[in-house]
């Protein structure tokens, strides 16, 4: 009736999928992959069954971490272990979770994307055909669009389009200046402007990129992976943030991503919508709520460290616990927000260092030529 003590691999699975994890523990994940690849017989099979149980839970964080671990297993473990991932039991679990409308949208989307990748990896092995079948069924659920669009042709911009690009740039600069002035006035008169400017800003931000000049867009987010096939193209992964520099062709823009510069197709990205003033206010309020709760968290930890197990049913203690647990989604969103900002700032720092290095090199060359005269 009761399971025995978890084996070493199951312990690693528990550590890698712990609901308290705020990010993937890749050292634990790769250790689990190494140990799985060195097993034989029922140990590996039972470990995958244990992973399946972690996946089949109501906790979205555990599910996402279990999917990350599963992805690492598919891409790093030996064939006999990967075949366990494509077993009837495991694939049925994936389909059940993806089909359940009560499953968190991030989990459903993650399953759809990963199953599509796994089906591609396993398609050459007839013993893993179940993953192909499940992939087709999940595609029909239409959770996410997995089909990357066709790359557009590199058509040169005509004079009319170049003129429009310049006009839009001047308009964007003037609009930015007027909004800056309006924002200064709003600080002095907070009741003078409200919903209308925000609605106009949102409408402008959400316009179709296909008809938007690059001069009106500062940042975009990748919707699909894009692998450069020609010199000068910019490779990126889905979710990457790209700084838009200029239009090069009709449907291709030049941009910078992770210290690389190149052109990319506009239909592979979407505009990064900047938060409105109201959204910024709400975000700041949520962040303050989390920091204001720090003393309560410390108080709960102190209480738990000195309370006997018999007090677990205490209503006051349970109330404090559930109040703190309710903060976790907000905390996770804040972590994601600042992780993204950190990545963008590090990318910006790298580009500034390159620019500084190039400038200093150019300056030294110039000074050297002057000294030779």
From Swiss-Prot:
Q: Which domain of life is it from?
A: Eukaryota
Its placement in the membrane is given as: Peripheral membrane protein
Annotated compartments: Endosome membrane
> What coarse category fits the chief subcellular location reported for this protein?
membrane
UIM domain mapped to chain residues: 164-183
Q: List compositional bias (Polar residues) regions by residue number.
A: 180-192, 199-213
Spell out the residue ranges making up region: Disordered: 180-213
Report domain SH3 positions: 215-274
The set of disulfide-linked cysteines is none
Q: Which SMART domains match?
A: SH3, VHS
**Which keywords does UniProt give here?**
Endosome, Membrane, Protein transport, SH3 domain, Transport
Q: Which GO terms describe its molecular function?
A: phosphatidylinositol binding; ubiquitin binding
Q: Name one GO biological process term.
A: protein transport to vacuole involved in ubiquitin-dependent protein catabolic process via the multivesicular body sorting pathway
Q: Where is the VHS domain?
A: 16-146
Name of a matching Pfam family: GAT
State the family it belongs to.
Belongs to the STAM family.
Output the PANTHER family linked to this UniProt entry: JAK PATHWAY SIGNAL TRANSDUCTION ADAPTOR MOLECULE
| Function as written in the Swiss-Prot or TrEMBL entry | Component of the ESCRT-0 complex which is the sorting receptor for ubiquitinated cargo proteins at the multivesicular body (MVB).
Name of the protein this chain belongs to: Class E vacuolar protein-sorting machinery protein hse1
Species of the source? Schizosaccharomyces pombe (strain 972 / ATCC 24843)
């Amino acid at each position: 009736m009761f399971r025995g003590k978890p084996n070493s691999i199951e312990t690693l699975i528990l550590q890698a999928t712990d609901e308290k994890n705020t990010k993937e523990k890749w050292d634990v994940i790769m250790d689990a992959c190494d140990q799985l690849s060195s097993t034989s017989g029922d140990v590996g099979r039972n470990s995958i069954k244990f992973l399946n149980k972690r996946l089949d839970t109501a906790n979205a964080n555990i599910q996402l971490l279990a999917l990350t671990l599963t992805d690492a297993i598919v891409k790093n473990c030996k064939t006999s272990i990967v075949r366990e991932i494509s077993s009837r039991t495991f694939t049925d679990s994936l389909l059940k979770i993806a089909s359940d409308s009560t499953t968190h949208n991030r989990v459903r989307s993650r399953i759809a994307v990963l199953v599509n990748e796994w089906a591609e990896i396993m398609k050459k092995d007839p013993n893993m055909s179940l993953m192909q079948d499940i992939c087709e069924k999940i595609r029909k659920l239409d959770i996410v669009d997995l089909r990357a669009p066709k790359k557009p042709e590199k058509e040169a911009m005509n004079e009319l389009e170049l003129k429009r690009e310049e006009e839009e740039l001047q308009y964007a600069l003037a609009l930015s200046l007027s909004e800056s002035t309006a924002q200064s006035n709003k600080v002095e008169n907070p009741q003078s402007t409200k919903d209308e400017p925000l609605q106009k800003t949102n409408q402008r931000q959400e316009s179709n990129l296909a008809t938007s000049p690059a001069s009106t867009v500062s940042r975009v987010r990748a919707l699909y992976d894009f692998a450069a096939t020609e010199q000068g193209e910019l490779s990126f992964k889905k979710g990457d943030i790209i700084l838009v520099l200029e239009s090069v062709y009709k449907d291709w823009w030049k941009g910078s991503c992770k210290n690389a510069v190149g052109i990319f197709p506009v239909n592979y990205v979407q505009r990064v919508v900047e938060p409105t003033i109201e959204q910024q206010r709400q975000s700041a309020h949520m962040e303050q709520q989390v920091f204001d709760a720090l003393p309560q968290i410390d108080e709960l930890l102190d209480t738990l460290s000195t309370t006997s197990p018999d007090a677990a049913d205490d209503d006051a203690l349970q109330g404090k616990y559930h109040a703190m647990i309710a903060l976790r989604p907000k905390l996770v969103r804040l972590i994601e927000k600042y992780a993204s900002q950190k990545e963008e700032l590090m990318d910006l720092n790298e580009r500034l260092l390159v620019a500084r290095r190039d400038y200093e090199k150019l300056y030294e060359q110039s000074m050297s030529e002057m000294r030779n005269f």
